[in-house]
From Swiss-Prot:
Signal peptide: 1-29
Organism whose genome encodes this protein: Escherichia coli (strain UTI89 / UPEC)
Region (Disordered): 36-62
Protein name: Uncharacterized protein YjbT
Positions with biased composition (Polar residues): 41-55
Keywords attached to this entry: Signal
Amino acid sequence: MKRNLIKVVKMKSYFAALMLSVSVLPAYAGPLGTADKADLPQSNVSSPMMAQSLRQPDLQPISTDRKTECFRLYTPDRKPGVNCVPDGSTGH
């Protein structure tokens, strides 16, 4: 019983230290600055990746209407839902 109590005390101190480091450490990291466009490297062969910017027209609502078309198979064991395919709007 005493051995289990020691394990519990050690685990409590471990999690207390972990929670303290997770909550306090970011305060010492300092604020994150935003990069200026002039600071970003231009895309070329040696650096093919480039930061992307998001414009307001790029944000469009996604339609949640999903239509399903069913077609008849030439098999005697036709099962509902198995031979139905989406109309292409879902991408599946």
